[in-house]
Amino acid sequence: MKNLVIVESPAKAKTIEKYLGKDFHVLSSVGHIRSIVKKTKDGTPPIDVANDFFAIYEVDPEKKKVITELKKNVKAVGKENVWLATDEDREGEAIAWHLCKVLDLPIETTKRIVFHEITKDAITNAIKNPRTVDMNLVQAQQARQVLDRLVGFELSPVVWQKVPGGKSAGRVQSPAVRLLVEREREIMKFEGNSQFKVTAIFIHDNQEFKAELNQKFDTEEAANEFLNSLKPAEFIVSDISKTPGTRNPAAPFTTSTLQQEANSKLGFSSKATMASAQKLYQDGKITYMRTDSVNLSGQAIAAATDFIKRLYGPDYSTVRKFKTKSASAQEAHEAIRPTDITLETASNNSYDQKLYDLIRRRTLASQMSPAKLEKTTITIDIKGNNLPKGKKLAQFEAKGEVITFDGFLRVYGGNKDELLPKLQSGDEVNSHDITARQTFTRPPARYTEGSLVKKLEELGIGRPSTYATIIDTVQTRGYVEKGDSEGQPRDVIVLNYNGEEVSRSIVQEKTGSTRGKLIPTPSGELIADFLTDHFTQIVDYDFTANVETEFDKIAGANLEKSAMLHGFYAPFHKLIEQSGGIDRSKVGANREVGIDPKTNKPIIARFGRFGPMLQLGETDDDEKPRFAPLPKGAKIETVTLEQALEMFKLPRIVGQTEDGQDIKANIGRFGPYIQVGKLFVSIKPEDPHSITLEKARELYAAKLEAEAAKNIAEFPDGVKVLNGRFGPYITNGAKNVKIPKATDPKTITHEKALELLSATTAKPTRKRVVKKATKTSTKKK
């Protein structure tokens, strides 16, 4: 072994070593190796603000073995023969710098290589063209890391103290939560109206086609009047217009457009998309997946062009060079594309293969000819209808589209032809069915993961490497959740004219589906309001985007890291110092919903430690108040007295088990459940108000069966051998011990269990600090 190459991931190491040959040994750092310390031994701050934000780093405990192995190999080959091949973004550059520090490698001379695809040509070319660690990129990454750490370290304690149920606040995820909250409130304020849209099914030469009236009616009466006016009418073609058109392909994928399209077409979350893309990149199947460039290399364009001509013919090939609109994009990087455009199957994993196929087809389409279309509009006059004079002339319009040359649609986003019959001006067509259907204006759409990524990109918030993390974090914190409702039924009026008479019917449609949509939780709304009121800069879109721009300036050597950090920190820290004066009792206002008719006590909707809840009675009363969760979908501002009274009917006795134990149905922090003795059983998606005894017994029996399978052995002193989420283990209630892989858990005796328990030092239980709350009245404000 003459050379040592250090990469980030073990999977990538194997692929690269295969290309480099016997003179190179490739090892992995397994991602980041150091992070800013949480607490120093001597009490000094982890980030010294007065000393130009100097940060103290420590090797992550789980990486100590990795570092030992790397040091041994560095010593074997010599420092001059070490190559740092971490990823080509700022995070990768920072990892290279940390490796230099930990492995005592000279930053000025240690060879640094980058490549945006794991192919033999790319790796060989990188070895021929090494550089050194780019300290501007390192400084930009450190600025982001320090800033985010300072915001989290100083702002989160304020959130814990002042916001009921508050968990944390972050520099980038907080504006994302605000976006979702603002959209939700737009939806809540939206006042829709309805109109009647008229459509007709016409017939000509035994071919049916659809047409739409060129006006809508505001009332049922007006729509009904129009349909009745058609009883003596004839329908005559008055105009036929044909317009040629073209449709051009989209650019190859960037990180954000890949996440948007994978969410839209495949239903993938941003996190799942990036996990699959990472695997495909490490396997050498696609180029680097964190990029904001739409550029393709000349070699990639040539390969795609050759493949298109061979497979589809020269008419399908159109060479394009896309330009990135983003000023911060690095054109030296490439868009996400296959490393071998001829390869159709890249993975045995169905998710990875679906994503690869999407990337491959998008890349091919970007170098293919436009699709050619012919759009046809047929105008149909109504002759002889008896509408009163002065009414607007009504005409039907039928629109069709024929693809005369499919071009890029051959591989990406194909459409079906919308065919119309061959007609001439003056032809009469027969009406088969004419319908006036009530339609409703739609509120603004809730964000999906894909559309939120698009909005964040438009606002300049976040970068390719952070979008998936932002969306994952706001959900993990409990500020945002994914909806699962199919929507609520809504009555729709339908008027139908069959050529003789007008009939009226009511049909139902679903409205307001939240499936797959991102919805802010009450805690998310509360934190967004709190930050907007007291820490405006943290949730201000322009400010957050400007911070991202300043990171870009540091990376481009156009701004000093310390100057940027001082500019942000001084006003931010001043707000932290002033936060002591914020009155917690005024954060998240209480609302009296009404009076309980049974007890004559007020029912109050308010925020508690775990989020919004209902309270029956005052905290100052001699009798302790009762508590209940808000009904699903209700808010403090909107919950009704009727809904609240229903919640206080819980817990409800559903009936008894076969051995006579009460089955109680209730709702807790984690949703609806039944309780039998000390056993709790989730009943999602059942309603605790209406779950039947039969269903409750069925779920209880299934839980007992699962518990029985979990218990391998139980001894008289309380020691148990159990099947757990991560495998079999022994517990005495205070300490858990994993059973060695070579040991069959069914053979463990009481003596052996005690031996294993005593051989393992118990991990100290972290004491939860309970905040002392000041007793305040919850009377209506």
Residue ranges and their predicted role:
Residues 2-3, 15, 74, 132-133, ...:
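Basic, low-complexity terminal or inter-domain segments flanking catalytic cores
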Residues 1-145, 154-155, 214, 313, ...:
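Intrinsically disordered, low-complexity regulatory segments
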Residues 118-202, 242-246:
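C-terminal or mid-to-C-terminal helical accessory/interaction module adjacent to the motor/catalytic core
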Residues 10-13, 30-36, 88-92, 116-121, ...:
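Conserved nucleotide-binding/hydrolysis micro-motifs of P-loop NTPases
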Residues 218-251, 259, 424-430, 437, ...:
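Metal- or metallocofactor-binding catalytic centers and their adjacent structured scaffolds
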Residues 237-240, 248-262, 287-291, 443-455, ...:
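Short acidic, hydrophobic short linear motifs in intrinsically disordered regions
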Residues 261, 265-269:
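A conserved hydrophobic secondary-structure block that centers on an alpha-helix together
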